[in-house]
A protein has these predicted regions:
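N-terminal alpha-helical transmembrane segments of multi-pass membrane transport
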Residues: 1-78, 88-95, 106, 420, ...
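Transmembrane helix-loop junctions in multi-pass membrane proteins
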Residues: 5, 36-40, 79-84, 160-173, ...
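Extracellular loop-to-transmembrane helix junctions
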Residues: 10-46, 89-128, 148, 326-333, ...
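Membrane-interface loop-to-helix entry segments
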Residues: 24-31, 39-48, 170-177, 199-261, ...
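Helix-loop-helix module between adjacent transmembrane segments
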Residues: 28-33, 73, 102-127, 134, ...
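Extracellular/periplasmic helix-exit of transmembrane alpha-helices
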Residues: 33, 113-121, 125, 242-259, ...
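Flexible loop linkers connecting adjacent transmembrane helices
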Residues: 38-64, 86-88, 92-96, 100, ...
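Alpha-helical membrane segments and immediately flanking helix-loop junctions
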Residues: 57-90, 116-140, 151-154, 158, ...
C-alpha cells in the first residue's frame, strides 16, 4: 500500500516541481537581482551589521534579530543536514551547485519578501503586527487578487501541518536518535496497523509531542525567546564541526568542487548515468534549497512582519542574511562534506545516515562522538523549525478564518498530532509530501513578487537615497565638531 501511495506522491511531486515552477523561482530571483543591482553582494556587509543591531523605533512586537531568529528557527532544520544529503544522493553532486545558485538568487527574493512584509503589514485590535504574502498580495496587488492570497494562506497552513513544519522534522529527529541509541533496531516493538519500530521511535515521538505542546501554547514571543537562544548556539556548533571536516580534508576540496560543477551540467560524466540528467540535478538542488532556506516560499515574511522597525528596507536586508547563513554557509559545508567523503555513493544509506557517514569518515573523532554531535544538532535544529512553522501556520489560518481562538486551538492540536505521527512515516514519503506542498505554497508568492518587483525597487531607491544623505550629513557634522575642537 505504501509503495502505491509513494508512487502517486512521486508523480505529483514531479509535476509540481517541473520546469515551469523552477523557471519561475529562478527567474524571479534573477529579475530582482538585476533590478536591484546585485544588492545581495553590495549590501551584504550592511545587512550582517543590522542583523545584530536593534532598532528601537517603529511598530512591531520583537527585535529584528528576534524576528530573524524566528525565521531561522523555521529554516535551519533537517533541510541543512538531511535535505542536502538527500539532494546529492538523488541528483548527484551537481545538485549542490544548483542549490547554491538558487540561494544566491534567493537572497534577492528573501530581501523583497522581508521588505514587502513590513511595508504592507497591519496591526490587529490586540496590537499584534501581522504580515506576509497574503497581506502584500491583497494590499499591494489589490482586492481583486485576494483569492490568490487565500490560496497562499491555505497551502501555508498545509505546509505547516504536513510538510516542513512537522513530518519531515520529527522524522529526521527520530531517525537520528534511533541511529545513535539503537542502530541495529534490536529494541523492536510491533504497533498494530502501523508496523514494527524501535522503542526509541516510540519514546522520541512521545517526548517531542510533549515538548512541542509545551512551547507553542506560548505564541510568537515564547517561540522567539526560545529561538534567540537555541538557533545561534546550535548553528555555530554545527558550523564549527562541518568546517573542521572540510579543513581536515582540504586537499580533497578542489577535486570536490570540480566534481560538483561538472555534475551540475553533465551528471552522467560523474555518476555513470546512475542519477540521470541535468534537469534531475537542478530539480533536486532547487527543491531542497527552497526546503532549506525558504526563499520564495513566502514563510519568512510572516516572521519579518513582527519585527520592531519602521523601515521596510532595513528588515528586507536582515531577512536576506537568513538565506546567506542557511544555504550559502551551512548547506554548502554539508554538501561538501558529503561529496568529499563519498558518502553520497554508499549504497543502503538514506537521509541523516548519509551525513552521519560523512562526519564519521571525515573527522578524526570516534564514530560515536560524531554521531552524537550530529544527533544533538539535528534534534535542536528540527525542534526549533517545528516551533517556527506552527507560528506560520497559525497566521495563515488567521487570514483565512479571522481571529478565531477556537479554530487556532484546533489547528494547534492537529499540529501536535502531526508531530506525534511523523516518526512512523517513511523517509521517502515525508520528503515527497514536503516538496509538493512547498511548490504549491511558493507559486502564489512568486507571482506576487513578480507583480510587486517595481515597488521593491522604488522603496529600495528611496531608502538608500535618504541613507546616503544622512551619512553625508553625519560626516559633515563630525568634521565640524573636530574643527571646532581644534580651534
Amino acid at each position: 500500500m505504501w509503495s502505491a501511495i509513494q508512487s502517486v506522491l512521486k508523480q505529483i511531486d514531479d509535476f509540481v516541481w517541473g520546469v515551469p515552477l523552477m523557471v519561475l523561482i529562478l527567474s524571479g530571483g534573477l529579475l530582482l537581482t538585476v533590478r536591484l543591482g546585485l544588492l545581495q553582494v553590495r549590501k551584504l556587509g550592511l545587512a550582517l551589521k543590522w542583523m545584530v543591531q536593534n532598532e528601537e523605533e517603529g511598530e512591531g512586537e520583537i527585535s529584528s534579530f528576534a524576528a530573524l531568529c524566528t525565521a531561522l528557527s523555521a529554516t535551519i532544520g533537517t533541510g541543512n543536514i538531511v535535505g542536502v544529503a538527500t539532494a546529492v544522493c538523488a541528483g548527484g553532486p551537481g545538485a549542490l551547485f544548483w542549490m547554491i545558485v538558487a540561494a544566491f538568487l534567493g537572497m534577492a527574493t528573501k530581501y523583497a519578501e522581508g521588505l514587502l512584509a513590513v511595508k504592507y503589514r497591519v496591526v490587529d485590535e490586540s496590537g499584534h503586527s501581522l504580515g506576509g504574502p497574503f497581506y502584500y498580495i491583497e494590499k499591494g496587488m489589490g482586492k481583486n487578487w485576494k483569492w490568490l492570497a487565500k490560496v497562499f494562506a491555505f497551502f501555508g497552513a498545509c505546509v505547516g501541518l504536513f510538510g516542513i513544519g512537522t513530518f519531515s522534522q520529527v522524522n529526521g529527529i527520530s531517525s537520528a536518535v534511533v541511529g545513535f541509541f539503537d542502530p541495529d533496531k534490536s529494541l523492536a516493538v510491533t504497533i498494530p496497523g502501523l508496523g514494527t519500530y524501535s522503542w526509541v521511535v516510540v519514546i522520541a515521538s512521545l517526548v517531542l509531542t510533549f515538548c512541542v505542546a509545551a512551547v507553542i501554547i506560548g505564541g510568537v514571543k515564547r517561540i522567539a525567546s526560545v529561538s534567540q537562544i537555541v538557533v545561534p548556539f546550535m548553528a555555530i556548533i554545527y558550523f564549527i564541526f562541518a568546517l573542521a571536516l572540510v579543513l581536515f580534508n582540504i586537499k580533497e576540496v578542489p577535486q570536490a568542487i570540480v566534481t560538483i560543477v561538472q555534475a551540475a551540467f553533465n551528471p552522467k560524466a560523474v555518476t555513470g548515468g546512475v542519477v540521470g540528467s541535468m534537469l534531475v540535478a537542478m530539480q533536486n538542488g532547487v527543491a531542497r534549497g527552497i526546503f532549506s532556506n525558504e526563499a520564495g516560499l513566502g514563510s519568512a515574511p510572516i516572521a519579518a512582519a513582527a519585527a520592531q522597525t519602521k523601515e521596510p528596507v532595513r528588515q528586507g536586508l536582515v531577512s536576506m542574511t537568513g538565506t546567506f547563513i542557511d544555504t550559502i554557509v551551512i548547506c554548502t559545508l554539508t554538501g561538501l562534506s558529503v561529496v568529499i567523503t563519498g558518502a553520497w555513493q554508499v549504497e543502503g544509506l538514506e537521509g541523516v545516515q548519509v551525513t552521519t557517514y560523512a562526519f564519521q569518515n571525515g573527522l578524526p573523532f570516534s564514530n560515536q562522538f560524531c554521531a552524537a554531535v550530529l544527533m544533538i544538532c539535528l534534534v535542536f535544529f528540527a525542534f526549533t523549525t517545528i516551533l517556527g512553522w506552527d507560528y506560520y501556520g497559525e497566521r495563515c489560518l488567521e487570514y483565512l478564518t479571522g481571529k478565531d481562538e477556537k479554530k487556532i486551538k484546533i489547528y494547534r492540536w492537529l499540529y501536535i498530532l502531526a508531530v506525534f505521527i511523523g516518526p512512523y512515516m517513511t523517509v521517502a514519503a515525508v520528503w515527497t509530501i514536503a516538496d509538493i506542498f512547498n511548490g504549491l505554497m511558493a507559486l502564489p508568492n512568486m507571482i506576487a513578487l513578480f507583480a510587486l518587483s517595481g515597488v521593491v525597487v522604488k522603496e529600495t531607491k528611496r531608502f538608500f537615497d535618504v541613507y546616503a544623505d544622512q551619512k553625508m550629513a553625519k560626516k559633515k557634522s563630525s568634521v565640524s565638531v573636530k574643527n571646532a575642537a581644534k580651534n
